[in-house]
Amino acid sequence: LVIETIENIATKLSISISFKTDVTQTLIDITEIDLNAQDKILIRNTNAVINIKSKVGLTPLHLATLQNNLSVSKGAYLNDGDANGMTPLHYAAMTGNLEMVDFLKWTPLHLAILFKQLVIELLAKTFFDLAIENGRLNIVAFAVEKYIAAR
């Protein structure tokens, strides 16, 4: 009954769903999915896996970051990169989303990525570089302030 309900909701929302055999975890294949539809699926199905990835490596947190939506963040891996290695923090910096940048925490890994220290990057550019290129001076100032405070 749970699987049928989820399948019906998914069909109405044009979402592709696949299931594991043990039904304790439901895998949602995110193709091009409306975030509000994603929230509805996650709310209705508490067994949904939050750290799954689309074919291009996007997680629900990547999509949530693009829409300044913190509702799908609980239990999500903050450092998961997409197919190009871009984390939700990269996306938040590119879009100038200071609230999401602050929410995504300043872990030692993010500080290392910020200044290209001790990290082999999958991308030639860090989220800091992307913020500069996109004229997101609020993100640049915030990042520098956090870096100085962490020293």
From Swiss-Prot:
InterPro entries documented for this protein: Ankyrin_rpt, Ankyrin_rpt-contain_sf, Multifunctional_ANK_Repeat
Entry-linked PROSITE patterns: ANK_REP_REGION, ANK_REPEAT
Primary location: secreted
UniProt repeat feature ANK, residue ranges: 21-37, 41-52, 56-80, 84-104, 105-116, 117-125, 126-146, 147-151
Tissue: Expressed by the venom gland.
Pfam families in the cross-refs: Ank_2
Keywords linked to the UniProt accession: ANK repeat, Cleavage on pair of basic residues, Exocytosis, Membrane, Neurotoxin, Presynaptic neurotoxin, Repeat, Secreted, Target cell membrane, Target membrane, Toxin, Transmembrane
Highest taxon of the lineage: Eukaryota
GO CC, one annotated term: host cell presynaptic membrane
Molecular-function annotations in GO: toxin activity
Cellular localization per UniProt: Secreted; Target cell membrane
GO BP term, example: exocytosis
Subunit structure: Homotetramer in membranes.
Other observations noted: Iso and Leu residues are assigned by comparison with orthologs.
PANTHER family reported for this sequence: ANKYRIN REPEAT-CONTAINING, PROTEIN HOS4
Domain note: The H8 helix is predicted to insert into membranes and form pores by assembling into tetramers. The helix is contained within a helical bundle domain that undergoes significant conformational changes during pore formation to allow exposure of the H8 transmembrane helix and transition of the toxin from a soluble monomer to a transmembrane tetramer.
Sequence similarity: Belongs to the cationic peptide 01 (latrotoxin) family. 02 (alpha-latroinsectotoxin) subfamily.
Function field: Insecticidal presynaptic neurotoxin that induces massive neurotransmitter release at insect (but not vertebrate) neuromuscular junctions. Native toxin forms cation-permeable pores (with high permeability to calcium) in lipid membranes locust muscle membrane and artificial lipid bilayers. May bind to insect neurexin-1 homolog, insect adhesion G protein-coupled receptor L1 homolog, and insect receptor-type tyrosine-protein phosphatase S homolog, and induces neurotransmitter exocytosis both by forming tetrameric pores in membranes and signaling via G protein-coupled receptor.
Name of the protein described by the UniProt record: Alpha-latroinsectotoxin-Lh1a
